Amino acid sequence: MGPLCAVCESPTAFTLHFGGRCCKACAAFFRRTIALDLKYECAADDPCEIHFKFPGMRLVCRECRLRKCYSAGMRSELVRSKRENFACTRRKDSRNNSDAAPNSNSPSTRQSSSPEEMDDWSFQMFEEKPKIEDLPLTPSISHPPLPTQLMPEESSRTSSFDGGYCSSYPSSSAATHPSPPGMLYSIENNSILQYYHSMETGLCSKRRIMYTNTGMDFILDTHANLQCPFTVNDLRPHDYRNFRGMLRHDFVMLFDYATRFPEFNSFTSHEKNMFYRQIVAVDFILSSAYYTAKLGQAHRQMVLTNGEYLNMDPLPMSGNEIDARRYFDCDEDFSKYRALMPMHIAIWEESIVPFSKLNVTFEEFCLLKALTVWQATYFKLTENGREKCRRQRNIIIGFLSKMCHSPGGGGEHRVGELLMSMNYLRESAQKLTTSYVMLTVFNVLNCDSMLHEMLNFQY
């Protein structure tokens, strides 16, 4: 094991950086902070734990990480600004050019990145953004928070998560500016949480009408606070023989949900198509996970978005067992079961079980689902669309952070848990799409024509 980093305890601090012994990731963080003159604030009362083993632990609080950098002996005066680096490079190039003819392949004329600069992005999940004003916890604001103006060099970066994060709030020194008319949603006397809360309760009410026998009077009385479309008594056993995937009414419900997303109407036609398709996949995974956590986890039942359930204790056979065929009456049933059940088992093991352990509240679920949609769509949008995506993600992450740092909210560890869960949720959504493509290609399902169109869309 190598020498430990004085900041995050990584056993890779083989040399000194800026006067202190630290790893390349912490050195890159320190250099970027000083060079860009970034300011942070810690929302916790006690020093936050900074550790290399988990990315969320290393990045959970930039203010505390910066303090540890200074405690390790790192000095800001040893960090050269980008302007100084450019001047040095230009002088070096001029000297090289005076000694030899220019060579387009020579190191002096190529833009290169040092290992530390490369490490800067490989270890970073979230880019620093200029600070927005603190987002309110109470849903009694007259307008949603406006995004801040991004630095040009920062807005062009595209790391896996390039929004603000957790307890490190961006600096308030940056001036805020309103977006063009129609770019931001304008819901008076409503907060961002209320907005996504209303979207989700509306979707729950539609599913309750569609898939249960609940009276309309009850639905009208409870729709504003409906957090799950089903009760345990509403659930029906899943029948793979009649399963057709998503049907037309499912797409209608999600269409209404999608069009209510902030800035959706400002997307191009291609971006709207992309955004809607991502919502369909993310909703199936995340809503199933949430409904299961609320209704089926105690009975080890996987609850689907249409109110059907599958018993998962013990796990059903996948259909790939040696003697699996003898349990089915015909080859058609066997083929359909073998195509569908591995997909459901994978969703259960890879997403629903770990998500259920988080014990998310309905408010956390509303924000996390919207954030997952924005993140899943980000790299499929144009640069203009990505800018809108970054803006909306920053608003959600900022509010989620404030909510988790309220009394009893769990603090930075809770924020880290929720944000890290997006990794396996997005992966399951991608696998779900791939599985449906295969099911339609081989005509395993008698799918709705809308589902065929969704799966044939060219990204």
From Swiss-Prot:
A GO MF annotation of the entry reads: zinc ion binding
**Pfam families assigned:** Hormone_recep (PF00104), zf-C4 (PF00105)
| Cell compartment(s), UniProt | Nucleus
Keyword Glycosyltransferase part of the UniProt annotation: no
Q: Which residues bind DNA?
A: 2-81
Q: Which residues form a coiled coil?
A: none
One GO term describing the cellular component: nucleus
Disulfide bond sites: none
- This protein's source sits in the domain of life called Eukaryota
Q: Where is this region: Disordered?
A: 90-119, 134-162
Boundaries of every NR LBD domain copy: 188-458
Report TM segments. none
Gene3D superfamilies, per database record: Erythroid Transcription Factor GATA-1, subunit A (3.30.50.10), Retinoid X Receptor (1.10.565.10)
User: What job does the chain carry out?
Assistant: Orphan nuclear receptor.
Family that this chain belongs to: Belongs to the nuclear hormone receptor family.
What is the name of the protein in this document? Nuclear hormone receptor family member nhr-11
